[in-house]
Amino acid sequence: MFHEIHRCQHADAPLLVLSSGLGGSSRYWADDLAALTRDHDVLVYDHAGTGRSPADLPADYSIRHMAMELLTLLDSLGIQRCHFMGHALGGLVGLEIALLRPELLQSQVLINAWSSPNPHSARCFSVRKKLLLNSGPDAYVQAQALFLYPADWIAANGARLADDEAHALAHFPGTDNLLRRIHALQTFDVEASLARIQTPTLLIANRDDMLVPWQQSQHLAEALPNARLVLLEYGGHASNITDPLPFQRTLLDFLNAQT
């Protein structure tokens, strides 16, 4: 899989691995790299079947497949210990890795994640799938901002959204791949295994997230043995983009306490 390691200026800096959400592209984290590389080496990657990691995903593709793909990459790089941060679907990958290879994770940060399906998110993804199948990629990509960002941020960032949408269409992963990734996140369920996860975990959620109710993160904070929740008031589903300073401050305070 395509990956990049952005190096900290300090020798022997701890490694932070970033896993993006449904879109799968490492580009999602671009606004955060300057802050994160002050104290950490940062590995970003394009998920299989997205961006610069072309692949035809199998019909039974799952979050476990995604976790195994990332573990294969980390093994190939000789990485034996790291911090992990995942956004939404990327957070599900983190939960799966915490079950498969707990000794790898020094800590994990899960942003607007969940442990099992919920009716609200299921409704959102049903609408998004219908848009993709009935109206095509252009309508799907244009609607994406409505699920990710607060209304005032969308109104103030038209030029950026136009650029992002043009990039998303130019690198569209294909309908089959996208539907299989959506199916993977819709069927993910590790509810019965949460008590086994001992990894120090920070859960970041947003009250105004339209796609994933913040109560999903609250439930994770209650069910994971070594977790705490920080609830941000503003930012939608992607507050690292829409309101980065509170997000980055919360994240770095946690990471620095773990290192």
UniProtKB/Swiss-Prot annotation:
Family to which this protein belongs: Belongs to the AB hydrolase superfamily. Hydrolase RutD family.
Chemical reaction(s) catalysed: carbamate + 2 H(+) = NH4(+) + CO2
Source organism, top-level taxon: Bacteria
Keywords from the named record: Hydrolase
The name this protein goes by in its record: Putative carbamate hydrolase RutD
Biological-process GO terms, alphabetical: glycerolipid catabolic process; nitrogen utilization; uracil catabolic process
Pfam families: Abhydrolase_6 (PF12697)
EC number(s) stated in the UniProt entry for this protein: 3.5.1.-
PANTHER family: AB HYDROLASE-1 DOMAIN-CONTAINING PROTEIN, HYDROLASE, ALPHA/BETA FOLD FAMILY PROTEIN
Biological role stated in the UniProt entry: Involved in pyrimidine catabolism. May facilitate the hydrolysis of carbamate, a reaction that can also occur spontaneously.
UniProt keyword Hydrolase present: yes
Annotated organism of origin: Pseudomonas savastanoi pv. phaseolicola (strain 1448A / Race 6) (Pseudomonas syringae pv. phaseolicola (strain 1448A / Race 6))
Keyword Hydrolase in annotation: yes
TM helices/strands, residue ranges: none
A molecular function GO annotation: triacylglycerol lipase activity
